[in-house]
Amino acid sequence: MMSKKMKVLVVDDSPVFRALLSEIINSDPQLEVIGAAEDPYQAREMIKALKPDVLTLDIEMPKMNGVQFLKNLMRLHPLPVVMISTLTQHGADATLMALELGAVDYFPKPSVANTADMLGYRSLVNEKIRMAAQAQVGANQSMSPAVASSSAVSTSQYQLIAIGASTGGTEAVKHLLSALPASMPPIVITQHISAMFSGPFASRLDASCALSVSELTQGEVALKANHAYVAPGDKHLMVFRRGGQLYAHLDDSPAVNRHKPSVDVMFGSVAESLKGKAIGVILTGMGKDGAQGMLQMKQQGAITVAQDEQSCVVYGMPRAAVECGAAMHIKPLNKLPQFLCDLLS
């Protein structure tokens, strides 16, 4: 027997894009467009009448922009939302704000570049919408951790923390980092994100954390304590040791698990270069990127921890890590900062 289709409401002011997106979504046997609204006011009435499972929402719209509408929606009628973004600096800031307000995910409007790969674009859009329909909306919001305290970090046996995340991760990473003290070993972060968004993402983290956070932009950087480094959205971040010093370098080889940057690539390099002197953390996200790399870390003697199902927006990557035996510990997001600090002291 066929299961019930997930009901999608499309909100976009362009009639051409509404038609294209509706056609893409309806091509998926699990999804069905039950309506298309041209502005937030029309969307509000349609949400009440049609009760969609998931909403796609354009960031740039007349009358009221998508972010403002999302803010009202999350307060009055929380439901899974996937933002449709432009790959611009302004689009990046607005999208990250939308994710902070509770949107599950985003995808870019098709450009000339990605129309060439319309099949790939189609499957990306539908996968994100299917995932969002099953996401736990507000999982991050309810899990704000207390600021953790730590002592004697400089003498810890653990010389590096590696964090991997995908859907829901921009907020989970922020919650985790903003609750960590300023004194920490170097932290490397691979978050699945568009290249245009990784810089603004790092800047937002930097503004909300005691640690110094930056996007890795040069080919090779010596890793420093009390600093966190974010992989750019189009290159793998790898860690290696030269002499007594740890370095991160950017790798332009093909995508792994369909992702670039890939968490598996980062974790694998950490396993090789630090053996048991690292901590691996896998947070919310769809798919299974990071599970095999985390298993390598565990086999080399590192400590590994996965975010628990209840606090994940999407329990995909952590589930894969748990199921393959890679995760030694499973913790809710709000307990992770203190757990890391306890390990370090």
From Swiss-Prot:
The reaction(s) this protein catalyses: [protein]-L-glutamate 5-O-methyl ester + H2O = L-glutamyl-[protein] + methanol + H(+); L-glutaminyl-[protein] + H2O = L-glutamyl-[protein] + NH4(+)
Annotated Gene Ontology cellular component terms: cytoplasm
Catalytic-site annotation from UniProt: S166, H192, D289
Gene Ontology biological-process entries: chemotaxis
CDD domains in the cross-refs: CheB_Rec, REC_CheB-like
Residues annotated as domain Response regulatory: 7-124
GO molecular function, one term: phosphorelay response regulator activity
UniProt cross-references to SUPFAM superfamilies, sorted A to Z: CheY-like (SSF52172), Methylesterase CheB, C-terminal domain (SSF52738)
Any Pfam family the entry gives: Response_reg
Record Gene3D superfamilies: 3.40.50.2300, Methylesterase CheB, C-terminal domain
Modified residues (4-aspartylphosphate): D58
Keyword set, alphabetical order: Chemotaxis, Cytoplasm, Hydrolase, Phosphoprotein
Subcellular location: Cytoplasm
Domain CheB-type methylesterase: residue ranges: 154-345
Highest taxon, organism lineage: Bacteria
Post-translational modification: Phosphorylated by CheA. Phosphorylation of the N-terminal regulatory domain activates the methylesterase activity.
EC number per UniProt: 3.1.1.61, 3.5.1.44
Family annotation (SMART domains): REC
Record text about domains: Contains a C-terminal catalytic domain, and an N-terminal region which modulates catalytic activity.
General function of this protein: Involved in chemotaxis. Part of a chemotaxis signal transduction system that modulates chemotaxis in response to various stimuli. Catalyzes the demethylation of specific methylglutamate residues introduced into the chemoreceptors (methyl-accepting chemotaxis proteins or MCP) by CheR. Also mediates the irreversible deamidation of specific glutamine residues to glutamic acid.
Protein family: Belongs to the CheB family.
Name of the protein in its database record: Protein-glutamate methylesterase/protein-glutamine glutaminase 2
Lineage, broadest ranks: Bacteria, Pseudomonadati, Pseudomonadota, Gammaproteobacteria, Vibrionales
